């Protein structure tokens, strides 16, 4: 079995329980020393064989897989969450082609870690309900589909998380302030370098100071930039509709007149929900059933 495990943003105790279990049971681990702290390997057993992928090509990694049969427990340890810029699809394709069992163990993304360190919610009602994850094209421009980069998404003014772009601060600032951008020079930014590592840096600034702020960190990799009005450090006057006294859910009725206290609804079965604006449950149809995906 080959497990693509998300290591989380850095701190060894931010790997998931399942990820730690897979590391503890692994016969072989492939990890990138340039992106994942060595402390993550403390979760491994004493007999594990470790390969550092920092100097390996895809072909080198696949050769390690091919050298072991399906009974060998292999962990490919990726930084953050494997589904985000993890280059795992080409490895999954190999598993399909060679009839190998595999799984993805999700990890805590650096985006989540960065927002936690910034101390801000990324989706503030009435400010932004959308988070865009993107990057500058850079040396891998061929991988970037047309009109899907930073400048294109800047037109919407949503909260943006820009990864893999710290080495080009002037280009990043220019795209964020393009002629069609909804961002302003005073739009808040937060730069997070090596989130949850011992030497992490958190820098609050604005789009107008972003290039200088990035250069001041000295970082050219493992840095993430958050952009958007949701990052404003002033107290927001907006509030969630979900917890508003007048809002009804499957578990809470709208509050009594003159009161803001919650009013529990009657016990409902897992197949029931409440229609918006009504105090009665409705049965979900068969096409609304939630099921777990089948593991590969």
Regions found by a protein language model. Give the residues of each.
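Class I S-adenosyl-L-methionine
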Residues: 1-113, 211, 274, 295
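A contiguous loop/helix-start segment that scaffolds small-molecule binding in enzyme catalytic cores
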Residues: 2, 60, 64, 72-74, ...
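Residue-level signal for pocket-adjacent positions within structured domains
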Residues: 9-10, 79-80, 117, 126-128, ...
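Residue-level signal for well-ordered alpha-helical positions
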Residues: 42-43, 117-118, 175
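Short, hinge-like loop/turn segments at secondary-structure boundaries
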Residues: 47-49, 120-125, 179, 207-209
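Short alpha-helices
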Residues: 109-113, 119, 222-223
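Short, glycine-/small-residue-rich phosphate/pyrophosphate-handling segment
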Residues: 115-142
């Amino acid at each position: 079995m080959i497990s693509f495990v998300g290591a989380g943003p850095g701190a060894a105790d931010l790997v998931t329980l399942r990820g730690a279990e897979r590391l503890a049971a692994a016969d072989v681990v492939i990890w990138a020393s340039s992106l994942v702290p060595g402390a993550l390997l403390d979760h491994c057993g004493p007999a594990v064989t470790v390969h550092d992928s920092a100097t390996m090509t895809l072909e080198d990694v696949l050769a390690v897989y091919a050298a072991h049969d399906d009974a060998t427990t292999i962990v490919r340890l990726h930084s953050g969450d494997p589904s985000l810029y993890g280059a795992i699809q080409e490895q999954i394709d190999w598993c399909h082609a060679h009839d190998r069992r595999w799984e993805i163990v999700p990890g805590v993304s650096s985006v989540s870690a960065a927002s936690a360190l910034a101390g801000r919610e990324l989706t503030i009602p009435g400010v932004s309900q959308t988070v865009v994850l993107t990057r500058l094209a850079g040396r891998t421009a061929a991988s970037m589909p047309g009109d899907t980069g930073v400048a294109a998404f800047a037109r919407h003014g949503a909260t943006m998380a820009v990864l893999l772009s710290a080495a080009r601060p002037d280009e990043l600032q220019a795209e964020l302030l393009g002629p069609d951008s909804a961002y302003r020079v005073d739009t808040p930014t937060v730069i997070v370098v090596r989130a949850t590592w011992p030497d992490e840096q958190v820098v609050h600034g604005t789009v107008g100071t972003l290039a200088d702020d990035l250069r001041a960190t000295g970082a050219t990799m493992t840095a993430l930039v958050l952009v958007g009005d949701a990052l404003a450090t002033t107290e927001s006057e907006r509030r969630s509709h979900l917890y508003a006294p007048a809002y009804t859910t499957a578990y809470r009725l709208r509050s009594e007149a003159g009161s803001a206290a919650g009013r529990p609804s009657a016990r409902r079965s897992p197949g029931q929900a409440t229609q918006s604006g009504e105090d009665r449950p409705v049965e979900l149809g068969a096409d609304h059933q939630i099921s777990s995906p089948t593991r590969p």
